[in-house]
Design a protein with these regions (language model features):
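N-terminal glycine-rich phosphate/adenylate-binding segment common to multiple enzyme folds
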Residues: 1-38
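Glycine-rich oxoanion-binding loops at beta->alpha junctions
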Residues: 1-9, 61-62, 126-134
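Short beta-strand segments
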Residues: 15-17, 44-45, 54-58, 93-94, ...
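Short glycine-rich anion-binding loops that position phosphate/pyrophosphate groups of nucleotides
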Residues: 18-21, 28, 97-98, 145-148
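Short acidic, glycine/serine/threonine-rich loops at helix termini
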Residues: 24-29, 66-67, 102-106, 151-154
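Glycine-rich phosphate/nucleotide-binding loop
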Residues: 27-40, 47-54, 136-140, 144-186
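Mobile beta-alpha loop/short-helix "lid" or hinge segments that flank ligand
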Residues: 40-52, 81-86, 90
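Glycine-rich phosphate/diphosphate-binding loop of Rossmann-like nucleotide-binding domains
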Residues: 61-129, 138
Length: 186
């Protein structure tokens, strides 16, 4: 599959296999973007206004500010390839929105991105986990540890809400009537 992408016979690889192994094989066989050291796992993340690109979701547990800046470039490039009429807004996932919050790497990255003028994206600063789905930011950048925790938390929350909705709609006669009345909205 990686060879097909290399030979331009395919555009993407989808795998249910080991993510780490896929990244290693891809990095060894495919050309990286110039001056970018590390690949990142990314995903389209639904939000109130459409979709956001979120990266890194687990490939790089520890990152330098250079890596996070590279992820900003990669995420903005991916977003622009999907939505060519929009200039993406990029933010760093952090524990607060204030400039002084976060570890040294995230604060250093903030300073660099805040001073850098990019033609490819607008830097919006920090985004907190409770605003990931607001839709005000198109590209959300984090290290792989933080991104993976956010992803797993969102997945678990979605599963919990789905389970509770199913129980409430099938648990008694009123729930069943309510679900029938709301079937077109669900």
């Amino acid at each position: 599959a990686i060879q097909s992408v290399k030979e331009k016979k395919a555009d993407i690889v989808i795998s249910a296999g080991n993510t780490g192994a896929l990244l290693v094989v891809a990095k060894l066989n495919l050309k990286m973007i110039e001056n970018i050291d590390k690949p990142a796992l990314s995903a389209l993340w639904p939000n109130k206004k459409g979709m956001s690109v979120v990266l890194d979701l687990g490939a790089n547990i520890e990152c330098s500010s250079k890596n996070l800046i590279d992820f900003s470039i990669m995420g903005a490039s991916l977003y622009t390839s999907l939505y060519p009429d929009e200039k993406p807004n990029v933010a760093l996932l952090n524990i607060g929105s204030e400039e002084l919050k976060g570890n040294e790497t995230i604060k250093e990255t903030y300073q660099i991105l805040n001073e850098k003028n990019s033609d490819n994206y607008n830097f919006e600063g920090y985004i907190e986990g409770n605003h990931l789905m607001d839709g005000n930011v198109n590209v959300i950048v984090s290290d792989g540890f933080t991104g993976n925790v956010a992803l797993k938390t969102a997945e678990g929350t979605a599963n919990f809400i789905t389970s509770e909705l199913k129980k409430s709609m099938t648990g008694n006669i009123m729930g069943k009537i309510s679900s029938l009345l709301n079937i077109s909205n669900l």
